[in-house]
């Protein structure tokens, strides 16, 4: 399955919530009607969505937020289910620990897609070594930094400046001047913002 390359705002409208695909720290709410489905007149049917439909919709939403395709998402769920603890929370922790997401959370990329591009273009170092695998799992204590020759990129500086204004998550420590950060630990469920109901995904895969 190919990765979606169409209008990002349309995906947010389809899910009825801002997926932060277009702009990481600026809401789409003022720019488009998130409660109206894509199309000339939006969805007009008043039919109630089935439980299965809601579960499937939630899975699609989370896949789009993190930019993960179906096969990879299934692997994440299998690993989350294998681990001790709450499966839904484990799933979100695995997704949040992806290198591209950590780069985004540290403010080096204004969106996860931009962060993924930085990783793919070898602009990111992990513990001093170049790593260009967006899905790589980052562990507690890992240091993620911008490669020296990439530090002059205007988009990185602008993204970091905005991230400093809005604040960084408590589970990463960022030195904006050095353009590097430390992944302190995987976030607790309460640390993960966003309109996500992971229990629906667990129910879907438990059918």
From Swiss-Prot:
Which InterPro entries does its entry note?
Answer: Ribosomal_uS4 (IPR022801), Ribosomal_uS4_bac-type (IPR005709), Ribosomal_uS4_CS (IPR018079), Ribosomal_uS4_N (IPR001912), S4_RNA-bd (IPR002942), S4_RNA-bd_sf (IPR036986)
Q: What is the superkingdom listed in this entry's lineage?
A: Bacteria
Record-annotated S4 RNA-binding domain positions: 97-157
Cross-referenced Pfam families, in alphabetical order?
Ribosomal_S4, S4
Cellular-component GO terms for this entry: small ribosomal subunit
**Region Disordered: which residues?**
33-54
Question: What PROSITE patterns does its record include?
Answer: RIBOSOMAL_S4 (PS00632), S4 (PS50889)
The free-text function statement in the UniProt record for this protein reads:
One of the primary rRNA binding proteins, it binds directly to 16S rRNA where it nucleates assembly of the body of the 30S subunit. With S5 and S12 plays an important role in translational accuracy.
Descriptive protein name: Small ribosomal subunit protein uS4
Which organism was this protein described from? Ralstonia nicotianae (strain ATCC BAA-1114 / GMI1000)
Organism taxonomic ancestry: Bacteria, Pseudomonadati, Pseudomonadota, Betaproteobacteria, Burkholderiales
